[in-house]
């Protein structure tokens, strides 16, 4: 599965399915934006777990910039591999916003054989 590729490096940032949509760490004590961004990407990739190629395409996209609020602001999907295009194009503005930049995606893609 996709998460086996990430291994223990991101294990502490993966949120269980019971708390999907919540950060793995307290917002009041939030870590640097890069860690928040990685957590948001992992949550977003959870919706692509049914399609590894879909997840790789998400990481590969050079124009991708996700905006995550304190709750990551990710839309719920009914089935694996389905994405809401609005999540990729809309900015979610909040005091605890973390933007997944191209450099963050580049770092994340180093864990996936693309």
Curated annotation (Swiss-Prot):
It is found in: Vacuole membrane. It is a peripheral membrane protein. The keyword Repressor does not apply. It comes from the Eukaryota. Keywords: Membrane, Vacuole. GO terms for cellular component: fungal-type vacuole membrane. The keyword Nuclease does not apply. Its main location: membrane. One of its GO terms (biological process) is vacuole fusion, non-autophagic. Required for vacuolar fusion. Involved in the early steps of the fusion pathway. This is Vacuolar morphogenesis protein 10. It comes from Saccharomyces cerevisiae (strain ATCC 204508 / S288c) (Baker's yeast).
């Amino acid at each position: 599965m996709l998460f086996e590729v990430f291994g223990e490096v991101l294990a502490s940032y993966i949120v269980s399915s019971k708390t999907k949509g919540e950060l793995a760490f307290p917002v009041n004590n939030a870590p640097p934006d890069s860690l928040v961004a990685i957590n948001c990407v992992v949550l977003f990739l959870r919706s692509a777990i049914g399609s590894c190629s879909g997840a790789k395409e998400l990481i590969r996209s050079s124009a991708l910039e996700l905006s995550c609020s304190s709750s990551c602001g990710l839309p719920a999907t009914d089935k694996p591999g389905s994405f809401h295009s609005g999540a990729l194009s809309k900015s979610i503005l909040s005091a605890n916003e973390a933007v997944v930049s191209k450099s963050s995606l580049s770092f994340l893609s180093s864990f996936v054989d693309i």
